[in-house]
């Protein structure tokens, strides 16, 4: 092989994109952007397959309650260090900006909509993490109803990290859920982020086996 070809094989697609932008080659830059998007989501899918296999194997061998512990540990080690700002004293507008960013800039997902009413913000999204798994013909799901699966059977093992971390653990830490996840058909999900945590309806506490503390 030619040395030049070997050298070119070492260059990341991001560096190729930077060079195309610097040269003003918009056609190549757009093609590379599409390739990055395609490869990112395809490779993410391989990780989802892996995670689902691991969670299913653990549930089968150790029982479903072991998944609750795994999701809690993952919450402390991975999720709260990155998303703990949601429980800080920042404006609800800043919270929704940051929450949207996690979808658009971390997942690389374009949201269906962000809506606002007097009480809350609503995010509508075709979820390409847990929502993607729920589109598979087979995947790990709860055989029994647990507080950490919103009191329901047939909840995706992967998706259960949402009620465990952002509802149960958030209530333990701050007294209220970070946001509320509501899986929908066709891999979609609706998230509610209440502007004033005191206005989160009690039903959302009950569905994860928690009690809402009333102001004295």
Q: Where would I find each of the regions flagged by the language model?
A:
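N-terminal accessory segment detector
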Residues: 1-160, 165, 171-188, 196-216
């Amino acid at each position: 092989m030619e040395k030049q070809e070997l050298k070119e094989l070492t260059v990341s697609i991001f560096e190729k994109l930077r060079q195309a932008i610097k040269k003003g080659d918009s056609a190549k830059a757009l093609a590379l952007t599409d390739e990055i998007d395609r490869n990112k989501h395809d490779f993410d899918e391989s990780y989802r397959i892996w995670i689902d296999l691991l969670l299913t194997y653990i549930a089968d061998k150790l029982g479903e309650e072991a998944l609750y512990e795994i999701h809690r540990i993952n919450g402390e080690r991975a999720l709260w260090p990155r998303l703990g700002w949601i429980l800080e004293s920042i404006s609800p507008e800043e919270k929704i900006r940051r929450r949207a960013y996690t979808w658009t800039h971390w997942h690389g997902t374009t949201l269906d909509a962000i809506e606002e009413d007097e009480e809350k913000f609503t995010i509508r999204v075709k979820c390409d993490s847990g929502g993607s798994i729920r589109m598979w013909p087979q995947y790990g799901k709860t055989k029994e109803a647990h507080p950490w699966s919103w009191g329901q059977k047939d909840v995706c093992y992967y998706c259960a990290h949402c009620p465990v971390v952002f509802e149960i653990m958030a209530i333990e830490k701050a007294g209220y859920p970070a946001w509320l996840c509501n899986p929908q058909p066709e891999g979609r999900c609706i998230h509610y982020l209440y502007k004033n945590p005191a206005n989160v309806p009690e039903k959302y506490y009950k569905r994860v086996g928690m009690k809402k503390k009333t102001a004295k």
